[in-house]
Amino acid sequence: MMNNYPFSSNSPKSFNAYPRSDFDIESGTIRRARKFRNSSFHPIRMVKSLANRIHYYYKLHPVLVFLLSLSFGVTILIILSVYENHYKMLSNYRKPDIGFNDNPYAKLQNLVMVAGHSVYTSSNCGKVDGEDSWLLMPYQKHPGQAATFLAHIQKGIDIAAKDDEALLLFSGGETRKEAGPRSEAQSYWSVAESEGWFGKEETVRWRALTEEHARDSFENLLFSVCRFRELTGTYPHNITVVSYDFKKERFAHLHRSAIGFPESRFSFVGTPPSLNSREAALKGEALVRAQFQEDPYGCISKLLRKKLGRNPFRRTIPYPEGCLEIEPLFRYCGTAPYRGSLPWAQ
């Protein structure tokens, strides 16, 4: 019967036929086994090695290494800044949780903006189509001028009545000292109220509101977009602007491009000026349009001085509160279009 010998390593009788040491045949001695370096990852050593290399190259080419380091640092800062702004915009771009479940404006998706051009100064609304009921500038004093204001109001109401998802905003601030602290926007709303909303009170009145801080046509558009966000919790999907027909190029191209709103979702509806004022209006519009071409945001030229003069009661502009996602657009001042992130461009 064969005996089973335990050859396990734990047995005191185990036999190591192949020792781990190296046997030298010539000398007849056993040499210690060669120890191999540990190949594990050493980040500290790598960092030190990289630092030594950089130091070595810096001694050889100090200017080149400095410029490369500076370029790398600036690139990192730019990337961090872009991601920070993008994160802020995304984190802010959400509907407020409090009160918006019962907000009737939250379901509105489209903006209809009527740009104001004058302040109603009459103590009653019996003669809304009379020139003496409005504060008119010298270039506005023409027969039929007041009727053009009513045409804008009615056109805005008609457009909103055909779109159940539209918010109608009358836009214009307290621009004239002689008119007292009354805004163009409130004037238009009051006239619409006196006219019974031209037969569409039931469907339009509850979603017709005001933006009462704009001092020029660019602010009419930008401030109304912010006001829309303030009321609905989101930004308009479509925008329709109502003004004089000769201002189409200014609104549909210059102002729309300045805020980066998609052309396919922007509409302009124009009404004609009074017959006697058209020639002068076209000349004046050409001048203003040229100024906005040079200064798209109205912040560095005669447009700025004109705008400051249209705030006689020292009103503080509340925006961009209510639309913090586009705060950088409000702060931007340049001749080139704004290139930052915008909610409607996502």
Which sequence ranges carry the predicted segments?
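Low-complexity, Gly/Ser/Thr/Pro-rich intrinsically disordered linker/tail segments
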Residues: 288-346
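A structural signal for short, hydrophobic/glycine-enriched beta-strand patches
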Residues: 2-35, 55, 82-293, 297-298, ...
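Initiator methionine at the very start of the polypeptide chain
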Residues: 1-2, 46
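N-terminal signal-anchor transmembrane helix specifying type II single-pass membrane topology
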Residues: 25-87
